[in-house]
Amino acid sequence: LTNKYLFDKIHKSEVIIKQILLNQKIIAGIGNIYASEILFASRISPFKKGKDLKMKEINRLILSIRLILIKAIRCGGSTIRNYVSSDGTLGNFQSNFKVYGKSGKKIANCIIKKDILYGRSTFYCPKLQR
């Protein structure tokens, strides 16, 4: 995943960045939980359209994608409800969540909000994510 690749895919897009991240044809492997965490880490609003992202935001986004996914893999993923891996172990990345599932909680002088976008829960900090 390179900055140029992502820029080329989204710079004319009217689609919001949260949906772009979930589109497996553009970037494979990002699910709903990780999309919220990645957008928070990169300080980008989930409602921002692809065409409105500046190159410095795309750079931050790609760095956040890499960091969040590497950390999640090292932690064995996120165990929500009854998921276990093939060897029976539970993932523990959920202990690293900054925003996902934390609606109403305060972080960095901001109250985490939850909205439903295209039928998916989206957690974000309106003050920090623009």
Q: What role is predicted for each listed range?
A:
Residues 5-130:
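Basic, nucleic-acid-binding surfaces and adjacent catalytic neighborhoods in DNA/RNA-processing proteins
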